[in-house]
C-alpha cells in the first residue's frame, strides 16, 4: 500500500508538469512490475503440445531451484538436456540455477511444494520462451516408506512444475554400489518430464493403450497415468542396477499427476 501511494503521488506530480510524459511513464511502470503467470499455473499435461513442438515456443528456460547442499549432478543435467533436445526438438535450452535455503520440513505435502514454488520461482513464460521450474528438495514426500520399498523420487503437479526429492534420490543411490546419484537423478528427471509431455494419457493421446491401473480411494481400478510395459520409462516402478539394485515403487500416481492448477 505504501508503494502504491508513492507511485500515485509521483503520477500526480508528473501530470502537473507534463500530461503526455505522465501517461507514458505510468505504462512503463506497470509493464515492468506485472508478470503474467497464468500460462504456468495450468494442469499437468496442458503444455504438452507447446513442449513437444516449436509452433508457439522455440526455447526452454529451466529453473533448477535447489536447497543448499542438494544441487543435482552435472552429469545428470547434461543427460537430461540431451534427452529434452531429442524429444522436444528445441535446440535452445537454458538452465538457470537458484540456490535456496531449506524449508526445514521433515516431509513435504503437495500443497507445501506448491507454496514453495510460489515463494521461490523466478522464471515464467515470455514471448517464445517456455519456462519450467524444477525444485530439488532436502525433504522426502509425505507418506514415504523406505523400509517398505515405497517412496516418491519425483512428482509433477502443474503444467511446468516438478519436484525431485533429492534427499530420497541420494538415499536410494547409497543402497547399492551398482547405481549412483547421476543414474537415479537422470531417470527420475526423464520420467517426470514425460508427464509434462502428457504421458501417460495426461494430454497426449495414446497411440496404443498401455496405461497401467491402480486402486483409487474407493478401491476401484483406474488408470494411473503410468505405463504397463516392461522396460518403459513411464512405469510407476523404476528398477535401478539390475538384480543387485534396489527396486522402489513410485508413489507419484494420479493424485500428483492431477496436481493443482492455482496458488
Regions found by a protein language model. Give the residues of each.
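Bacterial N-terminal signal peptides that target proteins for export
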Residues: 1-8
Amino acid at each position: 500500500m505504501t508503494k502504491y501511494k508513492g507511485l500515485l503521488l509521483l503520477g500526480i506530480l508528473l501530470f502537473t508538469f507534463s500530461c503526455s510524459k505522465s501517461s507514458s511513464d505510468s505504462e512503463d511502470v506497470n509493464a515492468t512490475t506485472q508478470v503474467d503467470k497464468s500460462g504456468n499455473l495450468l494442469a499437468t499435461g496442458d503444455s504438452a503440445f507447446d513442449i513437444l513442438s516449436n509452433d508457439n515456443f522455440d526455447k526452454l528456460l529451466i529453473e533448477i531451484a535447489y536447497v543448499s547442499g542438494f544441487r543435482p549432478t552435472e552429469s545428470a543435467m547434461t543427460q537430461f538436456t540431451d534427452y529434452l533436445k531429442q524429444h522436444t526438438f528445441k535446440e535452445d535450452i537454458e538452465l538457470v540455477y537458484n540456490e535456496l535455503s531449506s524449508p526445514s520440513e521433515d516431509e513435504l505435502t503437495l500443497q507445501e511444494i506448491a507454496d514453495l514454488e510460489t515463494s521461490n520461482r523466478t522464471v515464467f513464460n515470455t514471448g517464445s520462451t517456455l519456462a519450467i521450474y524444477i525444485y530439488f528438495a532436502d525433504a522426502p514426500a509425505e507418506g514415504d516408506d523406505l523400509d517398505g520399498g515405497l517412496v516418491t523420487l519425483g512428482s509433477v503437479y502443474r503444467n511446468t512444475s516438478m519436484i525431485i526429492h533429492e534427499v530420497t534420490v541420494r538415499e536410494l543411490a547409497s543402497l547399492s554400489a551398482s547405481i549412483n546419484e547421476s543414474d537415479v537423478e537422470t531417470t527420475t528427471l526423464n520420467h517426470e518430464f514425460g508427464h509434462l509431455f502428457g504421458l501417460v494419457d495426461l494430454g497426449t493421446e495414446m497411440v496404443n493403450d498401455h496405461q497401467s491401473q491402480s486402486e483409487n480411494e474407493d478401491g476401484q481400478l483406474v488408470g494411473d497415468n503410468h505405463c504397463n510395459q516392461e522396460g518403459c520409462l513411464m512405469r510407476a516402478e523404476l528398477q535401478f542396477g539390475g538384480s543387485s539394485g534396489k527396486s522402489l515403487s513410485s508413489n507419484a500416481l494420479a493424485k500428483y499427476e492431477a496436481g493443482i492448477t492455482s496458488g
